[in-house]
Structure formats: structure tokens, C-alpha cells
């Protein structure tokens, strides 16, 4: 099954890597949601965003739409961190069932890549939120492509050595490193 990718609301992003084009189904690359009804457009794009494994955003041309998309991603990561903490002391089988259901509904980790050729002009609040999400910042699409290909190859490699019953469990990885900045304080 191909991974899913999401390009934020910009027309300036494109890939040259055939690996990225063949192994990731991108929303926003060759097609866009031309729906005129604002609610339908929001729901369609948000559904694609929620179920994506990879998100690429152009911060050089930051729009309110891109800011909203990145805010949704942060909200999902925060919700996942809360859920992970709530169920951290349950048995292994229950944890895997909960992770499966969470992933099915978009509560999962995703790789985020941001094109930003001038980090000094980026709003510090936005930069802080993206840093909490372990975002990869790049000066060019070439850098993003290289990092994305490496991440994709890593995911393909670990999936070969991990047995997963698709209908029951999801990959149980160590997510502490990725979500430590989102840990809920007492």
C-alpha cells in the first residue's frame, strides 16, 4: 500500500524524484480540490491532510490556508500525545488495538518538511510549533526530496522486518523521542 502525501496550499512545490512520485500518493501535486463550497472544500482537504504520512509546506509563501493546515497537524500530534499518555500503562494488546484505531482515524505520526529559504523571517510562534513536531526545515525542494526519500526508504526497511496483522495491530514503534515536546504536564 502506498503512503499518502499532502502538499499544502501552494502551487510552487514539485518533485523530480520518481521514487517519491511512484511510492507516495500526493494530494495537491497534480490535482487540487476545486470545490467551490467552502465547507466541502475544507472537509475534503482536511480528510486528505489527516490521513497523510508526509506533509510538505512552503513557508516562503505562507498563506492563512497553510497556517490552518499546519495548525491541524499540531492539534493531531497533541491529541495523539494525550492519548498515548492516557493508555501508556495498559497491556500491550490493548495499546496496539488503540493505536490501530487511532491511526485509522488519522491520529498518527507523520513526517513534515518545510521549505523556508529565510528562517530569520519566520514567525517565532510558528517556528516553535513546527519544531515541536520535529519538522525538517530546508532551503530548497532538492533538500526536501533527499530527506523524504531517506525517510521513505527507512519506513520501507522497517516494515520488512516487522510483522503486522493489518486488521488488528499497527507498527509499535518508540514514539517517545518524536513526541517528548508534546508531553502533557500535570
Regions found by a protein language model. Give the residues of each.
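Conserved catalytic or regulatory cores that recognize and/or transform ribose-phosphate-containing ligands
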Residues: 1-186
